[in-house]
C-alpha cells in the first residue's frame, strides 16, 4: 500500500491509497470494518473498500481525531465519529478519503476519476445540462471532469439535504447560485482527478 497526502490543514485532510500489495491483510483495518465486506463483492470491490477505509483512517489520524471504526449507514454511506465528517471514493487500484473537523465543516464530499476515461456525447448527455454540454464541446471541461464534480457535490449534499438528487439535478458549473456556501476544488494526481467539495459552518 502506498499512502499519499493530497491536502492537509489543521481542519481538513485528503489522503490517497494506491494498491501495492495484498491490503486485505492490512493490520490497521479494524475487524468491525472488514466484517462489512459482502461475500458477493468481487475481489476488486473488497480490496477497494478496504483501501478506502485505510485512506479514511489515515485522514482521521492526520487531524488528530479519535480513530474509531468507520461503519456503514443508510445507503452504504460511512458513519463517522462525532468530531468528523468525511467521504470516500475509489477506482480499481486507488482510493481517496476526505475528512474534516465537524466543528468547522457541515459536510464534505470527494470523487476520483481517471482523466484518460473519455465519455461519448450520448453518455455525458445523460447527466449534463446544456451549459455543461457546451463547455465539453468547447473543450473547457471534459465529461469525466463534470461527472466527478457532480459526484463530489452530490456526496456533500446528500448528508445534509433530505431532497433526493440525481446527477442531472446537480449543476457543476453554477452550483453556488443554489448553494452559496458550497466550495469545490480539483486536485490532479498522476492520471487521476480528485474533486473535493465541502460546506463550512
Task: Identify the function of each model-found stretch.
Residues 1-201:
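Core catalytic alpha/beta fold that binds nucleotide/phospho-ligands
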Amino acid at each position: 500500500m502506498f499512502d499519499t497526502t493530497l491536502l492537509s490543514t489543521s481542519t481538513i485532510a485528503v489522503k490517497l491509497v494506491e494498491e501495492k500489495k495484498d491490503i486485505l491483510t492490512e493490520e490497521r483495518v479494524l475487524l468491525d470494518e472488514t466484517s462489512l465486506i459482502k461475500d458477493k463483492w468481487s475481489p476488486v470491490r473488497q480490496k477497494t473498500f478496504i483501501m478506502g477505509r485505510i485512506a479514511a483512517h489515515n485522514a482521521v489520524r492526520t487531524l488528530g481525531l479519535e480513530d474509531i471504526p468507520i461503519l456503514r449507514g443508510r445507503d452504504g454511506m460511512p458513519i463517522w465519529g462525532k468530531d468528523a465528517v468525511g467521504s470516500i471514493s475509489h477506482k480499481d487500484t486507488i482510493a481517496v478519503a476526505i475528512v474534516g473537523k465537524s466543528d468547522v465543516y457541515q459536510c464534505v464530499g470527494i470523487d476520483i476519476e481517471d482523466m484518460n476515461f473519455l465519455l461519448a456525447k450520448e453518455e455525458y448527455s445523460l447527466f449534463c445540462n446544456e451549459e455543461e454540454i457546451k463547455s465539453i464541446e468547447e473543450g473547457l471541461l471534459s465529461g469525466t471532469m463534470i461527472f466527478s464534480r457532480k459526484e463530489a457535490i452530490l456526496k456533500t449534499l446528500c448528508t445534509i439535504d433530505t431532497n433526493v438528487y440525481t446527477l442531472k439535478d446537480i449543476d457543476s458549473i453554477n452550483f453556488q447560485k443554489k448553494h452559496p456556501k458550497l466550495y469545490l476544488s480539483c486536485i490532479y494526481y498522476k492520471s487521476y482527478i480528485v474533486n473535493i467539495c465541502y460546506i463550512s459552518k
